[in-house]
Amino acid sequence: MDYCSLLVVSFLITVMTVLASKENDHELIKNPQNSLSSWISSSSSSSSMLVDVCNWSGVKCNKESTQVIELDISGRDLGGEISPSIANLTGLTVLDLSRNFFVGKIPPEIGSLHETLKQLSLSENLLHGNIPQELGLLNRLVYLDLGSNRLNGSIPVQLFCNGSSSSLQYIDLSNNSLTGEIPLNYHCHLKELRFLLLWSNKLTGTVPSSLSNSTNLKWMDLESNMLSGELPSQVISKMPQLQFLYLSYNHFVSHNNNTNLEPFFASLANSSDLQELELAGNSLGGEITSSVRHLSVNLVQIHLDQNRIHGSIPPEISNLLNLTLLNLSSNLLSGPIPRELCKLSKLERVYLSNNHLTGEIPMELGDIPRLGLLDVSRNNLSGSIPDSFGNLSQLRRLLLYGNHLSGTVPQSLGKCINLEILDLSHNNLTGTIPVEVVSNLRNLKLYLNLSSNHLSGPIPLELSKMDMVLSVDLSSNELSGKIPPQLGSCIALEHLNLSRNGFSSTLPSSLGQLPYLKELDVSFNRLTGAIPPSFQQSSTLKHLNFSFNLLSGNVSDKGSFSKLTIESFLGDSLLCGSIKGMQACKKKHKYPSVLLPVLLSLIATPVLCVFGYPLVQRSRFGKNLTVYAKEEVEDEEKQNQNDPKYPRISYQQLIAATGGFNASSLIGSGRFGHVYKGVLRNNTKVAVKVLDPKTALEFSGSFKRECQILKRTRHRNLIRIITTCSKPGFNALVLPLMPNGSLERHLYPGEYSSKNLDLIQLVNICSDVAEGIAYLHHYSPVKVVHCDLKPSNILLDDEMTALVTDFGISRLVQGVEETVSTDDSVSFGSTDGLLCGSVGYIAPEYGMGKRASTHGDVYSFGVLLLEIVSGRRPTDVLVNEGSSLHEFMKSHYPDSLEGIIEQALSRWKPQGKPEKCEKLWREVILEMIELGLVCTQYNPSTRPDMLDVAHEMGRLKEYLFACPSLLHFSSQETQGEASS
């Protein structure tokens, strides 16, 4: 990125002090995103410099004195150092330079603004060095945010202990490298403090007792430091308004030499608004007693994991009726899982793993309607898996491994159709693998682990329906029979472990043809015959283990076998070949060359039969296309001419509305023609889509088709048509003007000078698009396949609601998968329709002569999701990587996604939300990647339908609402206070 090389703020000051009369001063600014274009253009064209400054982007002046009182140039990708000359803005109340790339140190001169400055935000930059103690002079400061920089050294005492301590409400120094203690002594009274965010530093010492004076505190986050001492019970007891308390990953202990948690829980009894409590990773000792019932009924999340808490889980925890997350994992808890947990009807995630819990899993857990994750792994639980788990329709991850569970795998688990992970490994389960489970869990997309049990019988053929699953582990059981060749249908499979069973017969070659398989272990079975060549020819296989079978034949050291050692073939005495340590093969006699023509003739005949017949059939099939009657389209157009819903607009009215289709009104162009913005006589703002006369013959069918679809469909997420205008040589669609342009402009703001969206907005937009396309596929009066879904065809209204547009190449669908063309539309088997759509978004089957289907739109939507997360256009990936966006993302999934998720988070990170929400944001981004990969699978039949996709996007949208906003102290409130 080309960062600014000039101090932007310094330039502002030189202009204000009328030192900017030199014509070339504006040329010193390197402004890569053109974020400050108004500064440059106005300073070079206007004679009244002072007035111009007040009109500049990010600048606000006092209306009476025209003195600059606010400077907010946050989130504009600016760089350079912050100039000390900022102190010359003596009337400044708000200074916000956050979310840029400023480097260097914080100028101590900012402290001279003590008479006026109320809000200072320098967060999310690259600033380093110490925090200047001069900032302690800012005695009117209300809001201080220096978080997410590279600051080091100790926190200056003056920052907390001076005149400003009476006014400071918000302090964020988080995510730096600050050391030393929290500098609060008995003389410091931060009485107005509501937010204290010091997480992810290197702070030591105890929580200062004088913090108890901050009785208005709502949010205290000291997580991920090196703080020590007893949990600050006396401090917390004086904070009745506390809503969020994060003390995880420090070195705190409980009372009475780390044996008693009771005083701390008692101190929280006054905090009736408490919503989240996190104490994880402190090695806290003690028990969770019945006093937990006195905690706030508003509690939503409790994190007590990674401690040394012992005793049982008190049934009284069921009094916390609003709890959605309970994490007690990695402790020393014993006793049974309380049945009373079923009273927590809002529970979504329960983590009880890695404890010493005993008894049976309560069947009542199956009555928690929203439960999406249950992890009770690594305990001493016994008994059977409850049948009631089949009631958990929202269950996505079920982890029961590492217990002493017995009985069979319940068939009812097949009802948990949203399961992504099922891990029942390392138990004492018996019986066969239920057909009802594997046949219904088609959506299982992460892993299935049934290893280390006593399961018997064959692998059900229905397992092959799991075409989304990434990993299957059935090892260390008593399974028998053949390995089904149908497992080759699990096309997403990357890891397959069938070792230590009783499988016999030959190894199916279809496993070697799995396109993403990386690891295969079939050791310790009774497999016979040769290793199929497909395994050696695989380009993805990295780890193979064929040991201790009865395999025979020649093994080459070529292809995927080139990096294998003899350890992959131990105990297979009948194998020979060129692997180091393996016995060499005996030479075979060569057949006379006279047999070669005979063999070729025997092979050629069936090949011609196999490949020739489909070609003949395909040519016949192309002649039997069903088409829409041309008369139907024309009759409909005549009928709509008198429809009051579509007012008639003359050609002259459109000329007047668009200024004669002036170039200044042009807002877009494409193959079909041009789009102009305009204003009708009733002040309606419109977009006029005009068909180019030069291409009228070629695209007239597209024009009619778009008219037809827009008039027949109505949905809040589809563009509506105002009317049409046609005359000889002129065809136009009149549509509402979308003030926020296309999604493409927001995904690539550097190209279009648009503001970035955030993750919440993007998920809402994708949810809107999915709803719109689902309507077209399943509920529209005429079923429609869009065929060209991409960011530029998604428009955003003034409320950032997404509307799908551009139906010029859509197909009308008559049956479930039967495409019916309009008068000029043909199958994708024709030259005209072969690659109908946009490169990078076109489903691969369209390039092989397949007809338009709803699966193609699902593919395009998946590409859209992957594009949003990766920040890369699919065409860029094709050019630079030589692969599709799906293949690019698949190569990073799941182990190498951290960098991609980090970059996505840096681009789309929501503002005005606590850093604590980052865990949730990462999960949402990961799920967007997973959904994108599922939607872009090569085989169309394995993709979900758009109703399922819309449901998933709706769930992610609701999931994001779980993260609270900064409750009281919004930036608007701060600015309002600053300007008062």
Curated annotation (Swiss-Prot):
Protein name, per record: Putative leucine-rich repeat receptor-like serine/threonine-protein kinase At2g24130
Sequence positions bearing Phosphotyrosine: Y775, Y841
Extracellular side: 21-593
SUPFAM superfamilies named in the record: L domain-like, Protein kinase-like (PK-like), RNI-like
Class of this enzyme: transferase
Glycosylation sites: 55, 88, 152, 162, 175, 213, 257, 270, 322, 327, 380, 391, 428, 449, 497, 545, 554
Any GO CC annotation of this UniProt entry: plasma membrane
A Pfam entry, by short name: LRR_1
